[in-house]
Amino acid sequence: MPLLRIATRKSLLAMRQSEYVAARLRMLCPDLDVVLVPMSTRGDEILDRSLAAIGGKGLFLKELELAMLRGDADCAVHSLKDVPMDLEPPFMLAAVLSRDDPADALISNVYLSLESLPIGARVATSSLRRQAQLRFYRPDLRLFDLRGNVNTRLAKLDNGDYDAIVLACAGLRRLGLEQRMTARLAPPEWLPAPGQGAIAVESLTEDARIGTLLAGLDDLPTRQCVVAERTMNRALHGSCHVPVGAYASYGVGGMRLQGLVGCVADGRLVRAELCSAKDEGDMLGRAVAQCLLDAGAAELLAATA
């Protein structure tokens, strides 16, 4: 029986996502023996500083990529929003699975919406993108960094450390925690991170056997949308250091891409959106990035450099 080893982070959410990928692979190839290889990454271990301060989201990938290079794993499963815009050779995105809910969720044990939070309420999130949008809609809020796994973050909310926190809807759904969502923060008013809600599988470019297996998981509409989002982010030189949001969706006759660049300090948001054919995501991403730059995003990006 052929064997396929999936490198994954040890967190409950990462394991759930990897188990889902494994189940899909077993459905596609019933004779395939799929096993998970759980690993700890530096991004999971260093929790007292922001991702921007310790090197960015790529810290969630490094150990998993090394496992593939050593021959200890055949592929790795990630939340696509955590995958850097450019994968260094010899790695590739072999599959992007059908997207789950791309929205963020406001979670509070007392207040029912962002608008109902009292003046000066304490809201926690580690994402600069979320902080910038919170600052735009509610400049009075007190914002705090919050890292750790989903249950750790929820525990801090439940202990009274904060009045509300913001997490990704998709992660909560995959953990069976939909009931904790107080309000969805969703497009078009609120934009997610590029690729948010999608699961990606990374493999070695040279491994044609694994690439062929994983290609059966790929969802073309999702891939086309996230290509547009990630191309926009790449053209802006975006990273976890920069508050960038993007969301592409299918509409009548084409694809629509909405993008934003924000500033946490003063809550400024620069927005742009364009439409194109569904197979022109790369061109659409570059065009929206240029619109953002022309509208003043260059100033905000320079301030974060």
Swiss-Prot record:
Signal peptide: none annotated. The modification S-(dipyrrolylmethanemethyl)cysteine is found at residue 240. Its EC number is 2.5.1.61. Binds 1 dipyrromethane group covalently. Keywords: Porphyrin biosynthesis, Transferase. Gene3D superfamilies: Periplasmic binding protein-like II, Porphobilinogen deaminase, C-terminal domain. It comes from the Bacteria. GO terms for molecular function: hydroxymethylbilane synthase activity. Pfam families: Porphobil_deam, Porphobil_deamC. Its cofactor is dipyrromethane. It is an enzyme of class 2 (transferase). GO terms for biological process: protoporphyrinogen IX biosynthetic process. GO terms for cellular component: cytoplasm. Monomer. The porphobilinogen subunits are added to the dipyrromethane group. Belongs to the HMBS family. NCBIfam families: hemC. Tetrapolymerization of the monopyrrole PBG into the hydroxymethylbilane pre-uroporphyrinogen in several discrete steps. This is Porphobilinogen deaminase. It comes from Xylella fastidiosa (strain M12). The gene is hemC.
